[in-house]
Amino acid sequence: MRTAAKATLALVAIAALCLGAFSAAAVAGKKKKTVVVYFSGSPKFNKSGKVTAKGSLNTASVCKPSRGMRFQVIDVNGTVIATLDGSTSDSSGNWSLSGQLPSSLPAGTNSVRVKATKRTAGKFVCQAGVSTPVAIPPAT
């Protein structure tokens, strides 16, 4: 009788573990990659240090609207030095950001990039994504 009770207890424990593993996979959701792209001619730098960028998100349609967008200055190692602007994408995944470059930046060593933040949309996990870094041109 003790053997039957142990076997039953073991089966219940195994069933609970399987159910837990299945639930964890369901909660994790389906991951969707995000690629941040610039429109042609973007970003634009002017002589006074103002920079503007426009573009869109290449991702699943459910992940396009209301994504947090950050316009960042990064150094040669990819470390964020400053955040120039923040906004959200529109319903089509388009975004527009602008900001003033810090005056203390050494010429030719830094870049700007745009980052889309991570977001959950229903059963989907919209992963964070970044644009290709664009070198800040030397001041003329």
Question: Language model features by range: what are they?
Answer:
Residues 54, 94-103:
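Exposed aromatic-hydrophobic patches
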Residues 106-134, 138:
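Enriched for extracellular/lumenal, surface-exposed ectodomains of secreted and cell-surface proteins
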